[in-house]
């Protein structure tokens, strides 16, 4: 077993870190990958004398420890906690960072699952929230009250791909003693590292780009704040929403190719966005890589690429959006995102149905594309036939 769970020293390249951080070849066997420790419990040398710090798999597992070290390293963080899903990570963060009577600011187009958790669960515990367009710093500033404890940031947002200035919001948070959490799922650490920009916590649904193959569900919290990490760890263990060793293995395997995959996602997405922007059936294309996007300059400053997510609005409305989703052959009609295969969905009826009737309701003419890493010519041909 390797004793190195905190990454390699002296390595600066992100692609190299993603491959090597968290584990070195096993000194006994030479295995270059972390073994999958399918054990629920671990033998002790004496009462309370743990081997390598492991006692029970909910509390810790060598495979999960390696994944957490890798995630911390690629986000330029000190601490990371892995969870069984992105929503489990979200729930942990909210329970640690908020108390009854507190107030949280959220994006006015926040992910539907996050909205449902806050609106249906945390409001029962007397937690208030205010949806705000986070691209408008004056609106964020105006929403802060004496009870505000957290600003929940998505950038780019899901599904409208709005951009928030992480550095400016981080400065605002510090000025008012408000923590800033950034959901970095859409960008991934390959394109954006929020801790380096002033965020206190980074959240991931590792199901998406980090896992990258649509074969595992997971989540993560990364921070440089030891007190927060200890609180996250307490709930991770106490509530028990942890990934299995095999899920941790799949996630870590996906992480190794993240940088390479994101390069192709970026290339394909900008090509798709430019094609859609010129199509008469499309009234608007939402993609931060287009110079016409209102957040383009901020995205170019804080990201190393614009990502693989593209949203569009159909000129003929809801039924046209449904028809487009039904007609594609290469783009699969499915929820989720970030895998190697291209996906298409209508958020108002699928991933964001929980926002219907609320301030966060998603337009029903909106279609969201998760642009995969296939040959871009095939993707364009598929969209052409579906639109025509």
UniProtKB/Swiss-Prot annotation:
It comes from the Bacteria. It is an enzyme of class 2 (transferase). Keywords: Amino-acid biosynthesis, Cytoplasm, Methionine biosynthesis, Pyridoxal phosphate, Transferase. It catalyses: O-succinyl-L-homoserine + L-cysteine = L,L-cystathionine + succinate + H(+). GO terms for molecular function: cystathionine gamma-lyase activity; cystathionine gamma-synthase activity; pyridoxal phosphate binding. Its cofactor is pyridoxal 5'-phosphate. SUPFAM superfamilies: PLP-dependent transferases (SSF53383). Its EC number is 2.5.1.48. GO terms for biological process: cysteine biosynthetic process via cystathionine; methionine biosynthetic process; transsulfuration. Disulfide bonds: none annotated. Signal peptide: none annotated. Binds 1 pyridoxal phosphate per subunit. InterPro entries: Cys/Met-Metab_PyrdxlP-dep_enz, Cys_met_metab_PP, PyrdxlP-dep_Trfase, PyrdxlP-dep_Trfase_major, PyrdxlP-dep_Trfase_small. The modification N6-(pyridoxal phosphate)lysine is found at residue 208. It holds the Pfam family Cys_Met_Meta_PP. Catalyzes the formation of L-cystathionine from O-succinyl-L-homoserine (OSHS) and L-cysteine, via a gamma-replacement reaction. In the absence of thiol, catalyzes gamma-elimination to form 2-oxobutanoate, succinate and ammonia. NCBIfam families: PRK07811.1. Homotetramer. Belongs to the trans-sulfuration enzymes family. This is Cystathionine gamma-synthase. It comes from Mycobacterium leprae (strain TN). The gene is metB.
